[in-house]
Regions:
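Blade-edge beta-strand/turn elements of extracellular beta-propeller
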Residues: 3-10
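Serine-hydrolase catalytic core recognition
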Residues: 9, 16-319
């Protein structure tokens, strides 16, 4: 029948719970940007901690030499609030800026949890002298249907507008150098990287696109048609949302990264993009992993990819 909602956990950060079958107790795992996950057993009547089941000693962010990112509320292109995280390098700005992007539905990246602090790629880039920005644009998860529905029938449009708006805000604060802005992402984030370079070349100068969706008519229909309907019903949306439609806009540096046995975003997407870039006489760089799937899993491949990504930004934004 429902009733008054009562908060049972008070620790800052994100909590995930599993309730016992009898409803008397629950297991709570929580973390924040300042500390790693702690797992406790609690009573549902008041939230009292019965026992601490797991806690990593000495895992505070400062003990690991990590600087937790700064959480902030930013404005989307239409003025509504969106959440961002900023990893600051040492020294005063303006700094070269690298945007870490996903941007698609079903995901919320900016949370007060340990995973945000131990994003080692973002931390590595910050230690190399880059300001790193992550933003959950309109269309991302856990903000309600209206927030998600902004991308209905128009993927690849408002998400880019919001990332541009976020960049403009950190530039206006004097934190970022507008002439040295890069972007990277994987899967939908790879798609966003390509679309940002091509639809906003005056903002984004360098991008690393991992396993990018290139044309929505070549991706999982159960996912795509939920947001875009069918190509027959929404031809304009599919055309405007295709990376291949916008290749003429590319003027910056683009590194494509893809595994050739990717079962999620098939390699045909990158192959299509290469064909379109060649036809438009647009230069690009590419890193192929012949035996990898949606992203490298082999330790050597992971290390190689991370070194290549960082060196690409260093070459084109720090030099």
């Amino acid at each position: 029948e429902g009733g008054e909602v009562k908060r049972l956990t008070t620790e800052p950060g994100g909590h995930g719970c599993a309730v016992a079958p009898d409803g008397a107790t629950f297991v709570d795992t929580f973390s924040s940007r300042e500390r790693a996950a702690v797992t406790t057993l609690r009573r549902t009547d008041g939230g009292e901690v019965i026992a601490t089941l797991h806690e990593e000693p000495d895992m505070a962010a400062t003990a690991q030499g990590l600087r937790p990112p700064e959480l902030r509320v930013m404005e989307a292109a239409d003025g509504i609030p969106m959440f961002g995280a900023l990893y600051r390098p040492e020294g005063e700005g303006p700094h070269p800026l690298v945007v870490s992007v996903y941007g698609g539905p079903h995901a919320q990246r900016v949370l007060d949890d340990w995973a945000l602090t131990v994003d080692l790629r973002a931390q590595y880039l910050a230690q190399a002298g880059f300001l790193v920005l992550a933003v959950d644009n309109r269309g991302s998860a856990n903000r309600g249907l209206a927030f998600e529905a902004h991308l209905h029938r128009r993927m690849g449009t408002i998400e880019v507008d919001d990332q541009v708006a976020a960049v403009e805000q950190v530039v206006a604060e004097g934190l970022a150098d507008p002439e040295r802005v890069g972007i990277y992402g994987w899967s939908y984030g790879g798609y966003m990287t390509c679309m940002s370079l091509m639809r906003a070349p005056e903002v984004f100068r360098v991008g690393v696109a991992g396993a990018p969706v290139v044309d929505w008519d070549g991706y999982d229909t159960g996912y795509t048609e939920r947001y875009m309907s069918t190509p027959e019903d929404n031809p304009d949306g599919y055309r405007d949302g295709a990376v291949t439609t916008h290749v003429e806009g590319l003027s910056g540096k683009l590194l494509l990264v893809h595994g050739m046995v990717d079962e999620n975003v098939h390699f045909r997407h990158t192959a299509r993009l290469i064909t379109a870039l060649t036809a438009a006489q647009k230069p690009y760089d590419i890193q192929i992993f012949p035996e990898e799937r949606h992203m490298p899993r082999d330790a050597a491949g992971l290390e190689y990819m991370e070194r290549r990504l960082v060196s690409y930004f260093e070459e084109h934004l720090l030099a």
